[in-house]
Design a protein with these regions (language model features):
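Beta/alpha (TIM)-barrel catalytic core signal, keyed to glycine-rich beta->alpha loops juxtaposed to Asp/Glu
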Residues: 1-177
C-alpha cells in the first residue's frame, strides 16, 4: 500500500476492522501511517477506547453499520440462518430523542456519530431513506441527548457482526477483527 501512495495511485492508507493491538503493530512497522479506520460502530457498540487511540494517532474513523444493520437478519435467512439482531432503531431512548427533534431514529443515530466527529456510511437502497440520511445537519443533539445515547453502549456485547463471524474465525490469533 505504501508503494501505491508513493506512486500517486492512492492518497492514503486505510484499515478496516483492526483493533488497537493490530493498529499499534502497523504504526510501529509502517513508514506511512494509516489515515482512516473503518469499524463497526453504533449506539450499542461505541468503542470509545479505540476512538481515543485513533484520535491520539490522527486516524479518522468511519462507522459502518451506524444504524445497527436492521435488515441483516433477512439476509441471513436467505441462507437458512436465524440471527436475532437487536433493533437499535426501535430503542425507546432513540425514539424519544427522535420525537423531541421531529426526526427519525435513523437521523438521530447518524447525528450522534457525526457529533462525535466520526464519519458514517449507512447502507440504504431506497431514495426516501437516502434523502433521510442526508438530512441530519439541521439539528443538534444536546448534552442530555448525547448522554442518553452514550448510555446505550453495551461494549463488546453490543457488537453485531460478532453474531455473523464463523466459529472458526473466533479461534484466529488476530480475533477480534
Amino acid at each position: 500500500m505504501e508503494k501505491l501512495v508513493d506512486d500517486g495511485l492512492a492518497n492514503a492508507i486505510g484499515l478496516s476492522s483492526f483493533n488497537i493491538t493490530q493498529i499499534q503493530r502497523i504504526l510501529s512497522e509502517a513508514r506511512i501511517p494509516p489515515a482512516n479506520l473503518q469499524i463497526e460502530l453504533h449506539a450499542y457498540f461505541q468503542q470509545q477506547q479505540l476512538i481515543n487511540f485513533c484520535n491520539k494517532h490522527n486516524i479518522s474513523i468511519t462507522c459502518f453499520s451506524p444504524l445497527g444493520s436492521p435488515d441483516i437478519g433477512q439476509f441471513f435467512s436467505m441462507f437458512g440462518e436465524s440471527v436475532v439482531v437487536p433493533k437499535i432503531l426501535e430503542n425507546p431512548v432513540v425514539r424519544d430523542i427522535a420525537t423531541k427533534h421531529n426526526k427519525t431514529s435513523a437521523q438521530v443515530l447518524l447525528r450522534f456519530s457525526l457529533q462525535k466527529g466520526l464519519a458514517v456510511i449507512p447502507k440504504s437502497l431506497t431514495p426516501t431513506r437516502i434523502r433521510e440520511n442526508i438530512n441530519v445537519f439541521d439539528f443538534t443533539l444536546d448534552e442530555c441527548d448525547m448522554k442518553n445515547l452514550n448510555g446505550l453502549d453495551k461494549s463488546p456485547a453490543g457488537r453485531l457482526f460478532d453474531l455473523f463471524v464463523s466459529k472458526g474465525a473466533k479461534k484466529h490469533p488476530e480475533y477480534p477483527f
